[in-house]
């Protein structure tokens, strides 16, 4: 490209640029273009300026572009001029306000001077008025205090008359005034806490007199109401109940009223109980459908049950009637008695009884009301039981008494006379039951024939009768509320333990004593086993009976099983003839392990077995034949030996164990016989060799040969061929 020719972008190029390749020198137009191009049109000022120009509706002409700056400056000057005019008006208004404020300050100063002069003139009058108002307020306060004091601490003459005069009735007005007087008496403690206690002492003395007179009036009124009211119905009127609650603040007077009430109710309830025993009533008229309780006197259980049911009904009614006095109305009576205990410390029974228990007081009052009935009940139950000797009925009466003991304990407490009477009756019935059993034992022991065991060796009749009497008792206890869940493995005492000991143990001891009449050991063992089995079978369904007696019975039965095993074992040995052989072989039995391990001595001894009388051919053959004859019917004969035992399972077990012991004995005898034959053969061979070496005579050799031939012909094993395996098969 030539120097001074235009560049491709239209800009002239200089030789210097062409030669050196450097950037051109910035010019004013270049700078302006760079400034325009670098301007960000997102700038808020630029955007606002453009929007303003757009709103003016200017045309983009050359004329407009030349005059735009001048037009804008003219508009700015006009705006500034209008602002200056407006500020001039504001300055004029401020001048007017300043003049008004100055005028107001002058007026305020004049008023201040007038007020100061007026205050100086009225200040003495105001001070005097303030002093008078203060005195008036003090007088009014004292008047209010005096009125309040009189209203709170002083009773009017009419109120005192209502409170203390016996001519005035005891009504709600009386109780209101009494409550106010008690409040006055209590509030006097505040007066006694001040410096001047005279007023408090005088008011307290007067209030104490009024209270004592009021409580005495109330006490006499309640006594009068008790005498005039119908005590057949223990329900008290609301006024009497309220009076008793108030009177409870004087424990001495209160207990005096309750004593009168309890004595009256005791007499009435005793009379009602006697009337129920002799004549049934329904209201004021005779009830033809109801009969006197005495009509069932022939049946002690029903008789006692009817009496207890009547006593329970009367006790429940008495408690419900008296609950309104002690428990209801939010415990007002309890609060009154607690206040009375505080006011009369000497009324406490002991130092610990500082809190009144309404429930306990209720139970004590019910107990006092029912004490006469309890005495009559105790006498009549004792008479009914004393002439009865049926064990089941006696136990059911005991169970019935136990039920009512639990019931009455919840109603009147464990320490009440009624519960104590029933507990005493239970002891009396139990002693009567023991007496009946002692009479039965005396009757049995008095007749010697009654102690002779039966021919079939079954349980004696007196024992079965005792069990027949015991089973209904156990069933009754099992179905009763007294039944405790008893673990079969537990040996703890339960409520039935005294009964079963009283009704069973004497007869069990008597049965054991009667077994001494049997001289035969087998018969005596069978008899004792049958007696134990019949008792065990009877008590087994009842865990509470098993808990105390099954361990003793099981121990005795285990001992008897051992005796039965010995009996069966001896029977098998005796009937098979093996007893003779075992007795003869006893000296040849190894005494110790060391001796049994010595081969020579044992063989020499075993060889001597053939010389025993029991092992001679004739005797051994007889025993072998006796064994063969017995084996086919051995199990049947052994079972028949114990057939009088009333437990096939027990007989079977004893026989099986005896058979096992017999097989062990037979195996021992068999091994001894085989050992004897082997020992004899060894001795025969040893004798022959010794004679040849020593050069003995021929007749001795012949004799030995003859003896050796006899040993072969006379073998113990040949004469006694049975094996242990055969015995086990035949006895299985």
Swiss-Prot record:
Residues 1-27 are annotated as: Disordered. Residues 1-15 have a biased composition (Low complexity). SMART domains: COG6. Keywords: Golgi apparatus, Membrane, Protein transport, Transport. It is found in: Golgi apparatus membrane. GO terms for biological process: intra-Golgi vesicle-mediated transport; protein transport. This is Conserved oligomeric Golgi complex subunit 6. It comes from Coccidioides immitis (strain RS) (Valley fever fungus). The lineage of its organism: Eukaryota, Fungi, Dikarya, Ascomycota, Pezizomycotina.
């Amino acid at each position: 490209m030539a120097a001074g020719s235009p560049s491709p972008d239209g800009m002239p190029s200089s030789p210097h640029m062409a030669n050196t390749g450097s950037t051109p020198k910035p010019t004013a137009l270049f700078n302006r273009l760079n400034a325009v191009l670098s301007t960000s049109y997102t700038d808020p000022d630029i955007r606002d300026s453009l929007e303003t120009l757009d709103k003016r509706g200017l045309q983009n002409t050359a004329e407009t572009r030349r005059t735009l700056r001048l037009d804008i400056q003219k508009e700015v000057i006009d705006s500034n001029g209008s602002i200056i005019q407006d500020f001039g008006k504001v300055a004029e208004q401020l001048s007017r306000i300043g003049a008004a404020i100055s005028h107001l300050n002058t007026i305020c100063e004049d008023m201040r001077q007038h007020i100061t002069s007026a205050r100086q003139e009225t200040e003495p009058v105001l001070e005097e008025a303030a002093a008078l108002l203060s005195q008036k307020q003090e007088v009014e306060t004292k008047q209010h205090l005096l009125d309040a004091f009189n209203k709170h601490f002083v009773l009017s003459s009419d109120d005192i008359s209502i409170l203390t005069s016996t001519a005035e009735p005891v009504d709600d007005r009386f109780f209101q005034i009494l409550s106010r007087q008690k409040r006055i008496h209590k509030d006097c403690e505040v007066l006694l806490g001040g410096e001047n206690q005279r007023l408090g002492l005088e008011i307290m003395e007067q209030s104490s007199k009024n209270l004592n007179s009021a409580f005495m009036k109330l006490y006499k009124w309640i006594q009068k109401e008790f005498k005039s009211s119908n005590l057949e119905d223990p329900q008290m009127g609301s006024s009497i109940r309220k009076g008793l609650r108030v009177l409870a603040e004087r424990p001495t007077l209160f207990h005096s009223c309750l004593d009168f009430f309890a004595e009256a109710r005791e007499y009435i309830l005793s009379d009602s109980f006697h009337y129920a025993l002799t004549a049934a009533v329904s209201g004021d008229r005779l009830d033809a459908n109801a009969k006197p309780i005495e009509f069932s006197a022939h049946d002690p259980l029903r008789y006692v049950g009817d009496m207890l049911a009547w006593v329970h009904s009367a006790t429940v009614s008495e408690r419900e009637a008296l609950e309104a006095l002690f428990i209801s109305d939010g415990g007002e009576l309890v609060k009154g008695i607690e206040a009375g205990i505080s006011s009369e410390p000497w009324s406490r029974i002991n130092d610990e009884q500082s809190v009144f228990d309404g429930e306990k007081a209720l139970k004590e009052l019910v107990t006092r009301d029912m004490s006469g009935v309890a005495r009559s009940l105790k006498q009549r139950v004792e008479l009914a039981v004393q002439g009865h000797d049926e064990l089941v009925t006696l136990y059911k009466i005991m169970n019935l008494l136990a039920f009512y003991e639990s019931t009455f304990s919840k109603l009147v407490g464990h320490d009440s006379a009624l519960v104590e009477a029933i507990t005493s009756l239970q002891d009396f019935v139990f002693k009567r039951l023991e007496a009946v059993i002692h009479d039965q034992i005396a009757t049995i022991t008095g007749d010697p024939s009654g102690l002779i065991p039966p021919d079939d060796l079954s349980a004696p009749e007196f024992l079965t009768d005792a069990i027949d009497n015991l089973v209904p008792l156990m069933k009754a206890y099992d179905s009763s509320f007294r039944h405790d869940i008893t673990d079969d493995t537990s040996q703890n005492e339960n409520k039935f333990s005294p009964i079963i000991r009283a009704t069973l143990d004497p007869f069990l001891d008597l049965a054991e004593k009667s077994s001494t009449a049997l001289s035969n050991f087998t018969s005596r063992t069978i008899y004792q086993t049958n007696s134990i089995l019949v008792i065990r079978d009877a008590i087994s369904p009842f865990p509470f009976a098993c808990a105390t007696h099954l361990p003793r019975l099981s121990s005795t039965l285990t001992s008897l099983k051992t005796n039965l095993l010995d009996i069966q074992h001896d029977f098998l040995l005796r009937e098979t003839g093996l007893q003779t052989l075992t007795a003869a072989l006893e000296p040849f039995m190894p005494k110790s392990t060391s001796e049994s391990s010595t081969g020579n001595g044992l063989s020499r001894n075993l060889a001597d077995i053939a010389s025993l009388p029991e092992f001679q051919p004739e005797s051994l053959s007889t025993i072998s034949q006796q064994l063969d004859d017995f084996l086919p019917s051995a199990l049947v004969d052994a079972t028949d030996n114990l057939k009088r035992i009333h437990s096939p399972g027990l007989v079977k077990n004893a026989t099986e164990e005896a058979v096992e012991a017999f097989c062990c004995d037979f195996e021992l005898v068999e091994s001894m016989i085989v050992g004897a034959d082997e020992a004899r053969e060894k001795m025969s061979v040893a004798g022959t060799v010794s004679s040849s070496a020593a050069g003995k005579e021929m007749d001795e050799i012949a004799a030995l040969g003859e003896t050796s031939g006899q040993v072969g012909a006379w073998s113990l094993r040949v004469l006694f061929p049975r094996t242990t395996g055969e015995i086990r098969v035949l006895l299985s």
